[in-house]
Amino acid sequence: MAKLTKRMRVIREKVDATKQYDINEAISLLKELATAKFVESVDVAVNLGIDARKSDQNVRGATVLPHGTGRSVRVAVFTQGANAEAAKAAGAELVGMEDLAEQIKKGEMNFDVVIASPDAMRVVGQLGQVLGPRGLMPNPKVGTVTPNVAEAVKNAKAGQVRYRNDKNGIIHTTIGKVDFDADKLKENLEALLVALKKAKPTQAKGVYIKKVSISTTMGAGVAVDQSGLTATVAN
């Protein structure tokens, strides 16, 4: 417990909670303060100017980060026939239909992403109570229900992140690892923000991207000054 207290004291000394930092300074701070014994993820929280109580203002989607997430992703695909062969060729670890569903019902969940072709949803639909609570249920809005399962597998392997606002209108996702080059983290963040802007609900009024904070797995959030990001990202 003493180590945690010391770590938090150092973070409080270094990070001004009232300040918005230039993106490069923010990333440097994260790297300096990342003292865990494992390579921490760099996470982002984006406060959106939406009314999350209204379904037509909710933001959900997926985008492939230019430099990936640094995670090794295991993919399960529900499909059959030529699509099954294409999914395997694209790198999917698990491919099947009823047989794969039976594995999952038995508690065998050795995967991070589930993809399904539309004709397989009759099988996947039976797994809603298992996959849903884990955020693994395939959904066309994030590209995981698609006739082109091979492309979806490649996207998942390439570092695709899925995003969905919480009840407070905040998006939480990852943009890489703390050992990534600063430029790569910045470009991943900018790619995410561009995707979020494209997903802006037409009903959302006023400032859309209200606040951007980045943090490491074990660290505190550092607010980012959006004016230091690429012009296409700025509000």
UniProtKB/Swiss-Prot annotation:
Disulphide bridges: none
Gene Ontology terms for molecular function: rRNA binding; structural constituent of ribosome; tRNA binding
Matching PROSITE patterns: RIBOSOMAL_L1 (PS01199)
Pfam families (alphabetical): Ribosomal_L1
Gene3D superfamilies with a match to the protein in the record: 3.30.190.20, 3.40.50.790
BP term (GO), one: regulation of translation
Presence of keyword Repressor: yes
An annotated GO cellular component: cytosolic large ribosomal subunit
Keyword field: Repressor, Ribonucleoprotein, Ribosomal protein, RNA-binding, rRNA-binding, Translation regulation, tRNA-binding
Family: Belongs to the universal ribosomal protein uL1 family.
Assembly and binders: Part of the 50S ribosomal subunit.
NCBIfam families to which the protein is assigned, alphabetical: rplA_bact (TIGR01169)
Function: Binds directly to 23S rRNA. The L1 stalk is quite mobile in the ribosome, and is involved in E site tRNA release.
Protein name: Large ribosomal subunit protein uL1
